[in-house]
């Protein structure tokens, strides 16, 4: 017998990441790799990776749905509509998506067991203590002001490892090849700042900036963050290793040219 006083539980609305993304052909994104199982896209700087608060149909995922919507729809929300990892909005470069169950699951497993090789390029202030090295400071996520950030804690943090190599340098700046060996929030940005090399354009991990804001202080222009997801190497479904690279972004290219550095290709 039904209890007339019983109230059915109101179902919470699905978040943007659970709703089938709308295709948006107006967003132009270069396809770097497509073997029918895995897709690699070159995310532009300033483009959100996936739908979320304030960005429902103007993201990389929406662009991917315009070209590969049928395959991505079949993967569904449980497989993040094919999205295998994310980049901050301020960061451009290679992003991988699965196009089939086997393609998604294979690369997802490689991320989890850390057999994916990811390399970033960063232009930073100063120079690290050595031309090659590694930062292993543990990181913990905390809320500061209007955003979530990563900070070093002596106990209770998560393992974080970032390897760097100096490619070029001047008296005031350096061009770094950076390899995150773990995947913590803002890991590269936080670790480089900790070794005295904040990335050019950094608005969060800078000693002279307020620690509780992601916006530039009054009177200071908001210059671009010179960090790029440059290269990813993974094992494809066929079993061979594939290396995918993005071209150096315009802001980083201009800075490197002004410094007369050799341009990575």
Predicted regions and their residues:
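Acidic, low-complexity Ser/Thr/Gly/Pro-rich repeat segments typical of extracellular/periplasmic
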Residues: 175, 263-264
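Short coil/loop residues immediately preceding or within conserved phosphate-binding loops
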Residues: 26, 78, 159-161, 173-175, ...
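A generic structural motif
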Residues: 125, 167, 179, 235-237
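Residues that recognize and position ribonucleotide moieties
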Residues: 85, 132-133, 157, 186, ...
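RNA pseudouridine synthases
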Residues: 1-148, 155, 169-171, 241, ...
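Pseudouridine synthase
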Residues: 56-65, 100-101, 112, 141, ...
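Long C-terminal interaction/binding lobes of large macromolecular proteins
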Residues: 164
């Amino acid at each position: 017998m039904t209890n007339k006083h019983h109230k059915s539980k109101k179902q919470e609305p699905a978040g943007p990441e659970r709703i089938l993304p709308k295709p948006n052909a107006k967003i132009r994104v270069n396809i770097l790799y497509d073997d029918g199982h895995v897709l690699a896209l070159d995310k532009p700087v300033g483009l959100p990776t996936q739908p979320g608060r304030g960005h429902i149909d103007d993201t990389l995922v929406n662009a991917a749905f315009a070209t590969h919507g049928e395959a991505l729809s079949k993967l569904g929300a449980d497989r993040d509509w094919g999205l295998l990892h994310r980049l901050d909005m301020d960061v451009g470069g290679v992003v991988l998506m699965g196009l089939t169950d086997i393609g998604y699951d294979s690369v997802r497993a490689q991320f989890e067991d850390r057999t994916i090789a990811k390399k970033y390029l960063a232009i930073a202030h100063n120079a690290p203590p050595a031309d090659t090295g590694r930062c292993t400071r543990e990181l913990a996520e905390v809320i500061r002001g209007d955003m979530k950030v990563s900070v070093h804690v002596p106990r209770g943090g998560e393992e974080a490892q970032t390897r760097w190599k100096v490619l070029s340098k001047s008296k005031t700046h350096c061009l770094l090849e950076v390899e995150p060996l773990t995947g913590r929030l803002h890991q590269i940005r936080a670790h480089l700042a900790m070794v005295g090399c904040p990335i050019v354009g950094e608005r969060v991990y800078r000693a002279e900036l307020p620690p509780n804001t992601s916006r530039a202080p009054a009177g200071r222009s908001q210059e671009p963050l010179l960090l790029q997801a440059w290269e990813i190497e993974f094992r494809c479904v066929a079993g061979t290793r594939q290396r995918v690279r993005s071209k150096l972004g315009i802001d980083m290219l201009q800075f490197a040219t002004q410094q007369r550095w050799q341009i990575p290709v």
